[in-house]
Amino acid sequence: FIASEVMFFVAWFWAYFNASLFPTEQIGAIWPPADIHLMDPWHIPLINTLILLLSGTTLTWAHHALQEGHRKEVIQGLILTIALGLIFTGFQVYEYMHADFEFSGHIYGATFYMATGFHGFHVIIGTLFIIVCLGRMLSGHFKPDHHFGFEACAWYWHFVDVVWLFLFAAIYVWGYY
């Protein structure tokens, strides 16, 4: 499953770098297009990056606690990770509401919203996945030696984290400078 997700993001990065490294006359032969006011990467995008990195840490903490049989710490780690996922999503919505460009009209907006929107969708799905894990943990379904669903969730969440690091570097930082 994750391999198919990787292929989507590889295709997106291909389109993004093709448009940015070889801008055509249709977009004014510059990247980003002249009428685009980019977001400062060192404000909300950086905050979101730190939130996702912290969420990966809290989920890893919960996973280690599960392996050690520390139920209370697992629950705390999952609750923190859920909260961080929701905060990330809230900041992403705020960023969309205050962006100076739209999805339509140019390749920059289309690639920006497609990539960050698809990633945001994955964060929402991952947060729901973690909520399910929390419910299963509270119901006693996970044991130190039997927790594949938890591990699958952790792999998915870390994949989403890694994708964000590439998006942050490509869209926000590299695109800004």
Q: Model-derived features: where do they sit?
A:
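...captures the hydrophobic TM-helix bundle architecture rather than a specific catalytic motif
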Residues: 1-177
